[in-house]
UniProtKB/Swiss-Prot annotation:
InterPro entries attached to this UniProt entry: F-box-like_dom_sf (IPR036047), F-box_dom (IPR001810), G-protein_beta_WD-40_rep (IPR020472), SCF_subunit_WD-repeat (IPR051075), WD40/YVTN_repeat-like_dom_sf (IPR015943), WD40_repeat_dom_sf (IPR036322), WD40_rpt (IPR001680)
Keywords of this entry: Coiled coil, Repeat, Ubl conjugation pathway, WD repeat
PROSITE patterns hit by this protein: WD_REPEATS_2 (PS50082), WD_REPEATS_REGION (PS50294)
Region (Disordered): 709-773
Extent of Basic and acidic residues compositional bias: 716-733
Natural source organism: Mus musculus
Keyword check for Repeat: yes
Protein name: F-box/WD repeat-containing protein 10
Function of the protein: Probable substrate-recognition component of a SCF (SKP1-CUL1-F-box protein)-type E3 ubiquitin ligase complex which mediates the ubiquitination and subsequent proteasomal degradation of target proteins. Overexpression is leading to degradation of CBX5 and CBX1.
Alphabetical list of Pfam families matching this protein: F-box, WD40
Gene: Fbxw10
Length: 1030
């Protein structure tokens, strides 16, 4: 019990009893000696340089050979690891006036002091090593009061290293170690896992190297500990023994061969002040390329934190930054070389792939159906099935869910042309901005906030000061005269925009403020402490608190809901009134950095490069749509069913929320810097990157809705039809001549003028005629809308023969006859269906003959001439040597007026009169109607190298060539008659002996069997037939 020390908490209250408290009288007691040593230390400690201060402080702490003393100072210096202490220590020290002169004077004084200070340090260390625990505690406390923030941090690191070394040494004691005593604290309880104790016996040192190289080096220098016997040994040997216990085998450091050298060297000081960790730095042991590969996976913020881990990590982090910047530069150069046509149009502001920047429409969008109790209703009898690429749209997103249609408006916002104005081109990684419409924008890069006039590109003289830390979140409402700022100092400040005064401060968060949002008089804030708080702006009170397990990155508020997201990738929807969690949305594989929601939908953007769309109705938690990005999404918004997103590749994209198509790509910065945020109001958009702030001014758009477009299109079609009708009437009046009756009649053919609008005829009596429904009207698209000119009208007749053979028209715009037949008649006549029930067929035929054509129909009679062609008869079937019934080819074309041609009259192959075709048939004799036509050249045929074609003369009257209704018996008889007619037309052909001989030789050469080859050895038998041999 002799080694037992009093409680150190009472050590500062020990004073000399022989004199007053402020002047030590006795110079022999412990309190007086301590006071004198403190006074002597103050004379030189604050005047020496930082290196000397650090050496002396670390040497003093190295003399603390008690575990209880180390724990006591470790608890005192625990506050140095706090956030406010670190921030205060990292602040830049502003130089005072005349700093250079003071540095020169201080350097000269240091040179004079260095000669005597080292001797004074060793004297105090010698005295400190022989002092009691109470004296060591008092002197150390007073010495720490003279240290600045950097020295206090060094002291905390050294004490932590010494404590861990001493604790590991105690845990390595052998079981037979005698005289082990400990003194637990007052709050000690047997249920605690660990208890810090003070050991009275000297423990056995255990090697604890700081690094592999140092451990091997120091391990060879360890010597056996010399044991002290009795009290006659000198104090120097005792101090040397103590230092060997602390530094010798512990692997920390050794003072050298001189036992009186108590002042540590700079290498030992740096080793002790570097800190201690029981974990091993595996990054340091890995090869350089693997270490850089691992650090390259971190984001930008985490990589900046790695710089403060150690010097080795700082070097690696700097190299990774340089590699990433060079890689991004190379990729940008490659992308500029490989830019496509669509991207060029997108970068220049034009829309691509036929996107209409004026498009607008009102569509019905499905949303989950909610029953009366607030729960969503599920649809029955629906099976899950795989969806194709075309099925990924909003209408097919709801599976196994009943929906209802809600009318919404869609527009192609920000898809037109724009102008760019640069507000700032200064590179600043710490800059944040906020713009909410109007002419002012809030900017902050440090603890101060400024306002920028967008129209004049000028910074206002008002400056907002008051934050103790850098500003991390801003919200500006110029209309409501509100400016809110969240800072690193854990506070939220409410500023007056006009005066710059701080109106109110909101306290409550325990982490850095990361996001702010306002709805009316309600404020929502998120911080790194994982809390989302709702505040009343007028009173400054916290109304509700919502919690996450990870730091909050985004938070939004509306009248009904509060939506928040965290670094884990979880999005939570809270109800404002009941403060209950409505639903939790999971799907992102990284941190969700931005949010936006309205009454029906919610969009979230994350570090995984996805923008996910969700439903805000009820508790439906499935993802509706996903929009892929090449890099992380930093800002997202939803406007008129268009998703606007800012990506880390330096581009703003506009997607169609309904089908996921990308409508527009806007390249904000040519360097490819990430688009940190964007804000829009009307036709103006503000984009923010690390290197600049840009304003995109889009053109004013007059939205054209689809219903208006249809009306305009119908009106245009009607106007075109009216113009075509009027033109057709005038053309028919000028080109068509009236009929003239004369005695001479020539061949004629009747044609009806095309593209004439007919009036519907009066229906026949219901007893005789029936008009089927749906066969009267045809769409306008089915009409043949090719304008009919005189030349085209004449060419129609010459193309009849080719149309009859190839079933194709000579016009490039008119469809084939099969298609026209499928469409039905181009003129909307009511189809007449004979009703012969109870009536004779002859009566119906007479009634049809007596019926006239509808009024308004004009008939044009055009005479035709038939010209027989004279082909080359040498290789033709019409040669006299060939007996065939193939008719001679002929050409049918309209007969041109003789008054316009000087040639001889063409003779018609048809003599007599022309028969006019009425509704059925008629034998009226009509006079030919001469038609004016331009001079046409005669058709020349080239029979050589061309396969002969066979033409049949068309029946100009078109009699018995239409559809005939027959019974089975009549059809059989008709087929037999046609067969007999064909057999009668085919006659036996005379065999040319020369050709037969040639063919026989050819067969002989090919090796084919020939029965009557050369007719050798055979006897002619003419009585049996011509060319018959026996």
């Amino acid at each position: 019990m002799e080694n037992r020390e009093p409680k150190l908490k009472q050590a500062p209250y020990f004073r000399c009893e022989k004199g007053p408290n402020w002047v030590p009288v006795c110079q022999k007691c412990e309190a007086c000696v301590l006071a004198w040593k403190i006074f002597a230390t103050k004379e030189w400690f604050r005047r020496v340089n930082d290196i000397s201060q650090r050496r002396f402080l670390v040497s003093i702490l190295g003399q603390l050979n008690s575990l209880y003393l180390l724990q006591y100072f470790q608890n005192i210096l625990e506050t140095t690891q706090g956030k406010d202490f670190i921030y205060n220590r990292s602040r830049i020290k502003l130089s005072r006036k005349g700093g250079k002169e003071e540095e020169v004077v201080k350097s000269s004084l240091n040179q004079m002091l260095d000669k005597t200070v080292e001797r004074k340090m060793k004297e105090i260390l010698y005295w400190f090593g022989n002092s009691t625990h109470r004296t060591k505690a008092n002197y150390t406390l007073l010495l720490l009061q003279m240290c600045d923030s950097n020295l206090l941090l060094t002291a905390a690191n050294v004490i932590r290293v010494l404590f861990m070394k001493e604790w590991n040494s105690i845990s390595g004691l052998h079981d037979d170690t005698p005289d082990v005593m400990f003194f637990p604290e007052k709050k000690y309880s047997g249920t605690q896992d660990t208890s810090y104790v003070s050991w009275a016996a000297r423990p056995k040192p255990v090697s604890f190297p700081m690094s592999k190289h140092l451990g091997n080096k120091l391990g060879t220098e360890n010597v056996d500990r010399e044991t002290t016997e009795g009290k006659g040994e000198s104090s120097l040997q005792c101090i040397h023994e103590m230092n060997r216990q602390i530094f010798g085998k512990g692997g920390m450091s050794r003072l050298g061969d001189d036992p009186c050298n108590l002042l540590l060297s700079l290498d030992h000081v740096q080793l002790l002040s570097s800190g201690y960790s029981k974990y091993r730095d595996f990054i340091r042991d890995l090869p350089l390329h693997l270490s850089k590969y691992i650090l390259r996976m971190l984001d930008k913020h985490s990589l900046n934190r790695c710089i403060f881990v150690s010097q080795h990590w700082a070097t690696l982090a700097q190299q990774v930054k340089v590699d990433q910047s060079m890689h991004s530069f190379i990729q940008n150069q490659i992308s500029l070389l490989q830019v496509t046509k669509e991207e060029k149009q997108a970068y220049t502001g034009s829309y691509t792939r036929g996107i209409d920047p004026n498009y607008a429409n009102k569509v019905s969008i499905p949303v989950p159906k909610i029953v009366d109790d607030g729960k969503r209703s599920r649809s029955k009898n629906q099976k899950w099935k795989l969806r194709t690429k075309t099925d990924y749209n909003l209408w097919n997103a709801y599976q196994n869910q009943e929906t209802q249609l809600v009318q919404m408006e869609e527009r192609n916002v920000f898809c037109g042309t724009y102008n760019i104005r640069v507000l700032s081109d200064t590179f600043d990684q710490n800059r944040i901005i906020h713009y909410n419409g109007g002419d002012l924008m809030a900017i902050s890069s440090n603890r101060k906030i400024h306002l920028l006039d967008i129209m004049q590109t000028k910074e206002l003289p008002i400056e907002f000061r008051g934050h103790a830390g850098s500003v991390r979140a801003l919200f500006l409402s110029e209309e409501d005269n509100i400016l809110l700022s969240g800072s690193y100092d854990l506070s939220i400040r409410y500023w007056d925009v006009k005066t710059g005064a701080c109106v109110r401060i909101f306290y409550g968060h325990q982490g850095t403020i990361t996001c702010l949002d306002v709805y009316k008089n309600r404020l929502v804030s998120g911080a790194k402490d994982g809390q989302v708080k709702e505040w009343d702006i007028e009173t400054g009170k916290c109304l509700k608190t919502f919690k996450h397990k990870d730091p909050i990155l985004a938070a939004k508020i509306s009248e009904t809901y509060i939506v928040s997201s965290c670094e884990r990738g979880i999005v939570k929807v809270w109800h404002v009134v009941t403060a209950q969690l409505q639903k939790t949305l999971t799907g992102h594989e990284g941190a969700v950095k931005c949010l936006f929601f309205n009454e029906w939908h919610l969009v979230s953007g994350g570090a995984d490069g996805l923008v996910m769309a969700w439903s805000m109705v009820g508790k439906y938690e499935r993802c509706l749509m996903a929009f892929k990005h090449p890099k992380e999404v930093l800002q997202v918004s939803l406007l008129y069913l268009r998703v606007i997103s800012a990506c880390g590749d330096g581009k703003i994209r506009i997607y169609n929320f309904l089908n996921g198509n990308c409508l527009k790509v806007i390249k904000v910065d040519a360097r490819g810097d990430p688009v940190l945020s964007f804000f829009y109001q009307g036709n103006r958009m503000v984009a923010h990157t690390d290197s600049n702030i840009l304003v995109f001014q889009f053109e004013n758009v007059k939205w054209q809705y689809s219903s208006d477009k249809n009306k305009v299109k119908k009106s245009k079609d009607k106007e075109e039809e009216r113009e075509e009708t009027s033109l057709g009437d005038e053309h028919s009046r000028s080109t068509i001549q009236g009929h003239s009756l004369k005695d001479s009649v020539s061949s004629k053919q009747e044609f009806s003028k095309s593209r004439v609008h007919l009036k519907q005829t009066k229906n026949l009596s219901s007893d005789d005629m029936e008009t089927p429904v749906g066969e009267v009207s045809h769409p306008l698209q089915k009409l043949w809308k090719v304008p009919m000119t005189p030349d085209r009208f004449l060419l129609t007749i010459s193309a009849l023969q080719q149309a009859h053979n190839s079933e194709e028209f000579a016009y490039p715009h008119r469809p084939r006859p099969q298609v026209i037949d499928a469409w039905g008649p181009s003129i909307p006549y009511p189809r007449k269906v004979l009703s012969l029930k109870g009536k004779s067929v002859q009566h119906a035929v007479d009634q049809l003959r007596s019926s006239n054509l509808p009024t308004g129909v004009r008939q044009t009679n055009i005479p035709l001439e038939i010209q027989k062609l004279q082909p080359n008869l040498k290789k033709s079937l019409h040669s006299p040597r060939v007996q065939a019934t193939v008719p001679q080819p002929s050409l049918i074309r309209p007969k041109v007026s003789d008054s316009l041609r000087g040639d001889e009259h063409l003779t018609s192959s048809i003599d007599g009169t022309m028969r006019r075709a009425g509704p059925l048939t008629s034998m009226q004799v009509i006079k030919p109607n001469r038609m004016l036509a331009p001079r046409g050249g005669t058709a020349t045929l080239s029979p050589k190298k061309e396969r002969p074609r066979f033409y049949t003369t068309l029946d100009p009257l078109r009699m018995n060539t239409g559809f005939m209704l027959m019974t089975v018996k009549e059809e059989k008889e008709f087929a037999e008659a046609k067969m007999k007619e064909y057999e009668a037309s085919v006659s036996t052909k005379e065999v040319d002996p020369g050709k037969a001989s040639k063919a026989a030789w050819i067969r002989k050469i090919k090796g084919l069997p020939i029965d009557n080859f050369m007719k050798e050895g055979k006897t002619a038998a003419p009585e049996l037939g011509q060319n018959v041999f026996i």
